[in-house]
Amino acid sequence: LSREQLTSARASGVGSVVMFGATTGRDGIGGASVLASQELGEDDADKRPSVQVGDPFTGKKLIEVSVELIESNLVESLQDCGAAGLASALSEMAASFGLDIHLDRVPLRQTDLEPWEIMISESQERMVAAVTPSLVPAVKEICARWELPCTEIGTVTDSGVLRCFWNGEVIGDIPARFLTEEAPRYQLELAPRSKQDPPPAPVGPAFRQALLELLASDNIRDRSWVFERYDYVVGSRTVRRPGLDAGVLRLRPSLRGLALSLDGNGRIAWLDPRIGGAHAVLEAARNVACSGGEPLAITNCLNFGNPEKPEMAWELSEAIEGMAQACEALGIPVVSGNVSLYNETDGQPIYPTPVVGCVGLVPDVRTIGSAWREGDVVLLAGAARLSIAGSEYQALYDKVGGAPEEFELEAEAALIRFLWKNNHLFSIAHDVAEGGLAVCLAECAIFSGVGAHLDIPTDPVQLFGECGGLAVVACAREQVSKLEADGVPLREIGTAGGDSLNGLPLADLTRAWQAKEASSEEI
């Protein structure tokens, strides 16, 4: 899609409002809007909404229709029906003008829906568009060709009011701007949580046992039992499968690719939500860069406890600030996002967990490396102040506590640039994340099927500490001089080769990493 074809969600003038896609049912009524705005307990079964029923085939047709309508210049604005359904979509569309909407014209899956149910239903695969009246027949013709229902449900007006009709009678009206720019804002009380006392350094087992146990831990072990349940090569565009940093899809007909990653660490955010928010953004961007992509944008899901409690509100505010600082340092926008609040059980909140998805552009998918080769030079890129606080090592062998190290955002941005700019020279690039340097190196060996002889520290903090700012890269000896470090520290730590990692058999590492497969009850 070219920049010129980007379509606003807001109406830009008087015209018709059409709705196309799936029919509207009771599935998801009050879904995301309820779950994100109140606590639910054992006595609230009546508040638990029915789950939205997704239909990937209809979703694919909806995408194709939307693209064709945009390319044909048939729509003035376009908006999907997400959380809060039509109530949200129409509010955003009406913000600068007004809308008259006839809810009795909305195609229904169940004929006995009441008007308020139609407004807040979160049935999937539905779009609304503002269309010049003379172009409505052309819009309907395209929808019919794709076998998607399309109905004119109202008009864009210049009244500045969103009005809802039922069988010709006005049943609700409200100034449109009151639902958007002039909506009441929460004024939440913020109370910083007391700092965690740093616990003594955990006393873990010897290096070999610690590494094997970390590889088998829930947050690090092989994830293929999850993604192999889905067709991750559908469309035959998958260049790099899930499992190593970011997945990559080819953007046909060119050789460019789209790298996608998803990251979050609730333990880090619990110890320091500002650092945790930045951590999620930076790790997602590093993963994209390790896969050859220049990070372009992020989306997010903010998973927190009850924001009406001052400490929880402070966690949310701090995490958002950390994410904003990281995005500014990287020069990337937040293009979408959602929240999941009030996540508590018997008054105990979940870890504050900002989750970030990042997308990046790969110039040439043919150059992406996924395995080091015999004789490759192994380098450590970056310089970070590592910490055991909030690490997988600490969680495995002790109580989580202490303070994670602050990020040096300029250094992080420089490392990410180094990773994607030089990726065509790497046989593999992998960021140091959960499990620290030791796990990063073990994963490189496992993915490559080749061991390595490395000069690595023996201190547990240097081996298993976390907090970003580091990546392992490998390349042929003759390529080292071609690397454009641009101020990023580079240190040669060894050579790939053999069937062990510093004497630890590759077969043992792989066996530990693949040993635990979740039962159906865990999924």
How would you label these PLM feature ranges?
Residues V18, L260, L379, R491-G494:
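Hydrophobic/aromatic beta-strand patches that form the interior of the parallel beta-sheet core
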Residues T7-R10, G30-G31, L190-V339, N343-A438, ...:
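Non-catalytic terminal/interface segments that mediate subunit docking, oligomerization
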Residues V75, Q79-A216, A319-A326, L330-V335, ...:
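Glycine-/charge-enriched secondary-structure boundary and capping motifs
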